[in-house]
A protein has these predicted regions:
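Bacterial N-terminal signal peptides
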Residues: 2-11
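Beta-strand-rich, non-transmembrane domain signature
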Residues: 19-284
Length: 285
């Protein structure tokens, strides 16, 4: 079953025609956070840190990337009457990155105390339609095991871009202290019509040691998927589900080497996988 199908259904329906965009986004964000926190990820229950990392500024206890992409087609009456190609091809993408981080000093506290991101972007013209929404979720896990989810009241919303069409969310994480663990995720929902997705990058090295990194992809087999492993990145285990969707999985443990701040070229040195997913039957004009 595809991840977050309930969230997708929420996006494709309008419970109240008079609800404004901010309320719709707030509901979407709340439902997304519920879905993500409910995911069964065993690696995120591991809180033991090896002695060799005890002096690190921060340790990524677990990280997880999840990518789910579906495709559907529909008849476009307006394009048909106008003499254009009349089959619209829509691609829906759900892209998640989540990590659990141990905060050990002031530098790490500063690094993980503030976040900003673009909540919504909409681009549309006669050739294509693009809708993008992003959700940030943050939880603080205290040394005694207490879990504090950051309330949506702590998020500040600003607008930018042409005619203030792009919403920018900002968050200063309250209550985070040295010795805490912070559970963070970024969830991106992208809907494209007659257009291709940007490439995806899975990085197997970060600025802090990483005890576990897992990647799971579910991709509609009607799309063209190509990927390339670079700099020693591990290859995916490939399979298919009962619906014929392409499944790609990889898991890596104890990534000790980190990316330095100076004299380092990630594209040439960081193990990573570049993935291109294209609508091979995208209409042409």
């Amino acid at each position: 079953m595809l991840f977050l199908m309930g969230v997708l259904a929420l996006l494709l329906t309008t419970p109240n025609a008079n609800a404004d965009d901010k309320e719709k986004y707030k509901l979407f964000a709340e439902e997304t956070r519920k879905e993500v926190w409910a995911l069964k990820l065993p690696e995120f229950t591991n809180t033991a840190i090896p002695d060799k990392y005890k002096d690190e500024s921060a340790v990524i206890l677990a990280a997880h990337s999840r990518l789910e992409i579906t495709k559907k087609t529909r008849f476009n009456v307006g394009a048909f009457l106008g003499g254009f190609h009349y089959i619209d091809r829509e691609v829906n993408c759900r892209d998640l990155y989540r990590m659990l981080v141990q905060i050990n000093d002031k530098a790490a506290l500063k690094e993980f105390s503030e976040f900003d991101y673009k909540a919504e972007i909409r681009k549309k013209d006669w050739r294509y339609d693009e809708n993008y929404q992003q959700v940030l979720g943050v939880r603080i896990i205290k040394p005694d095991g207490t879990v504090n989810e950051i309330s949506t009241d702590e998020y500040m919303t600003a607008t930018e871009g042409k005619k203030d069409q792009e919403q920018l969310q900002k968050l200063a994480v309250p209550g985070l202290e040295i010795g805490d663990k912070v559970d963070i995720f970024f969830f991106n929902y992208t809907s494209l019509e007659n257009h291709n997705l940007d490439p995806f990058v899975f990085r197997f090295r970060q600025s802090h040691p990483m005890l576990s990194y897992t990647v799971h992809c579910e991709i509609d087999d009607k799309l063209t998927t190509q990927y390339r492993t670079l700099n020693g990145a591990p290859d995916f285990k490939q399979s298919k589900d009962e619906n014929g969707n392409i499944l790609l999985d990889v898991a890596v443990k104890d990534i000790e080497q980190t990316e330095p701040d100076l004299w380092y070229n990630p594209m040439q040195q960081t193990p990573m996988t570049l993935m291109y997913i294209t609508n091979s039957k995208m209409k042409k004009y």
